[in-house]
Amino acid sequence: SLRGRALTSELFPFSFAEVLAHRGIEVPGQWPVVGVERSRLQNEFTRYLSVGGFPEVQRFEEDFWRRTLQSYLEIALLRDVAERHAIGNVQALRFLVRRVLRSIGSRVSVNALHKDLQAQRIAVGKDQVYSQLAHVEDAFLAFLLPLHANSERRRQMNPRKAYAIDHGLVRACTPGRDS
């Protein structure tokens, strides 16, 4: 199909300071912050860790922001990954993304992901797992970072750690998770 040309620009979710500015909360000039101001900042930070930094969801209640972020995730999976890279096995892609987002801060190996897919009776080759993870990173949904080591061999041999582009996406795809 013919499509028009597009200019791409990378827009990332708000940082905590940007969320505070968006919500009209002034960042204190002196640290440490004490008293009521400290309590307010802690509450805002807890909310930021739950909701994330996508600007549109900042004003929503939990049920609505969760559904909105789930929709963002689904659109990114279908358009930015599956359609763009002609991935036919969307079930495997959904499983991989949810598994990676549920493993934030943990080590994730392609072998373990492949075994999990096989256990779920989702037919996918190990090379497809590698390529789908690369596409997920390309779409800025999650990042798999190597172990910090001076040895290149050690970096390559160890499983990578998973990180999400936004905290809210993690909460949106993990029902019942409070942290």
Language model features: what each stretch is:
Residues 1-106:
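Interdomain motor-coupling "hinge/lid" segment immediately C-terminal to the ATP-binding subdomain
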Residues 60-179:
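Accessory nucleic acid-recognition modules appended to NTPase machines
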